[in-house]
Amino acid sequence: MEAPPWEPVRNDSLPPTLSPAVPPYVKLGLTAVYTVFYALLFVFIYAQLWLVLRYRHKRLSYQSVFLFLCLFWASLRTVLFSFYFRDFVAANSFSPFVFWLLYCFPVCLQFFTLTLMNLYFTQVIFKAKSKYSPELLKYRLPLYLASLFISLVFLLVNLTCAVLVKTGDWDRKVIVSVRVAINDTLFVLCAISLSICLYKISKMSLANIYLESKGSSVCQVTAIGVTVILLYTSRACYNLFILSFSQIKNVHSFDYDWYNVSDQADLKSQLGDAGYVVFGVVLFVWELLPTTLVVYFFRVRNPTKDLTNPGMVPSHGFSPRSYFFDNPRRYDSDDDLAWNIAPQGLQGSFAPDYCDWGQQNNSFLAQAGTLHQDSTLDPDKASQG
């Protein structure tokens, strides 16, 4: 019997050779890893907030607000990846608001924390220089308003683009391009501003003392600033890169999905297997890593341990209970920062550290007075000596 002739047309139904296949167990394992990482960060931040109450720090401070924002961010990411355990399809077909809340709003929260850090460190610089340049204090209100305005712009751009992607008939790539152009520019500018603030603080003598009293160092602050700016800059470059590649038609034949996955997964209506893997890696590198570093750096410390550890507090500086975001005993308002005191008034400002010096001086003077009194009462002994 003669074999039927080979017809290449019938091979069109075969799957493409270069299409990647992610085994189900790999996807399930990555989902478990992502969920565990975000859940652990959530538990760690929750413990930090509990320590704020435990050590009786201020309830409302830069530190507590920062931790609350990170806690909300970690909870949203944990909920997002928990959806992929049971229903992968449902996780890709959320309503517009749920899509924005789980995919886009965590990026907004991360930007809010970056803005908050800029606001605080800029205010620290103002207060450190306020004795010699009092006119700097008048810029505090414009600084607050500018930070609020930038945060609102970032929020509105993300919300509008997310709604248009899910409901409108607009070109998806155009919408994402607008979002990337505005939001990533703000990210990079805030990261650069943060690095400049940290650099200025590292050059200030009072700031160095303040960092040492917290148990950190200028090297740690510099490392955190450089890491943050590099991560956020590379994030913006990645988003621009995938936008450029997604417009090249002949690249689509490879169908690897990674060039279509932005940091908010808004370039694809359905996140495929490979796209899901890339999305998780993107969030790990540009969200989980910098947030974890900053949360750990600004964690709540035990004041009792700081008091018993002489290496944590320099002999020339701040009270050991001074922290980056709050002082649980002295600060009733931001105007009570110790840096508002001139250097010549350090003895009155940092009384806890200088009490020991005063006691040593008093004991020395007392001994000198005793010797002088003895020599006065017995002049013969003095002359014989």
Curated annotation (Swiss-Prot):
Tissues/organs with expression: Widely expressed with high expression in bone marrow and kidney. Highly expressed in osteoclasts (at protein level).
Principal cellular location given in the protein's record: membrane
Family assignment from sequence similarity: Belongs to the GPR137 family.
Organism of this sequence: Mus musculus
Keywords linked to the UniProt accession: Autophagy, Glycoprotein, Lysosome, Membrane, Transmembrane, Transmembrane helix
Segments in the Cytoplasmic topological domain: 54-64, 118-144, 195-222, 299-385
PANTHER family with a match to the protein in the record: INTEGRAL MEMBRANE PROTEIN GPR137, INTEGRAL MEMBRANE PROTEIN GPR137B
Induction description: Up-regulated during osteoclastogenesis (in vitro).
Record text on subunit structure and interactions: Interaction with RRAGA; increases RRAGA recruitment to lysosomes. Interacts with MTOR; this interaction is amino acid sensitive.
Domain of life: Eukaryota
Role played: Lysosomal integral membrane protein that regulates the localization and activity of mTORC1, a signaling complex promoting cell growth in response to growth factors, energy levels, and amino acids. Interacts with Rag GTPases and increases the lysosomial localization and activity of Rag GTPases and thereby regulates mTORC1 translocation and activity in lysosome. Involved in the regulation of lysosomal morphology and autophagy. Also acts as a negative regulator of osteoclast activity. Involved in interleukin-4-induced M2 macrophage polarization. Also acts as a negative regulator of osteoclast activity. Involved in interleukin-4-induced M2 macrophage polarization.
GO cellular component: lysosomal membrane
GO BP annotation list: autophagy; negative regulation of bone resorption; negative regulation of osteoclast differentiation; positive regulation of protein localization to lysosome; positive regulation of TORC1 signaling; regulation of macrophage activation
Positions glycosylated per UniProt: 11, 260
Lumenal side stretches: 1-32, 86-96, 166-173, 244-277
Transmembrane segments: 33-53, 65-85, 97-117, 145-165, 174-194, 223-243, 278-298
Name used for this protein in its record: Integral membrane protein GPR137B
Membrane topology of the entry: Multi-pass membrane protein
Subcellular location: Lysosome membrane
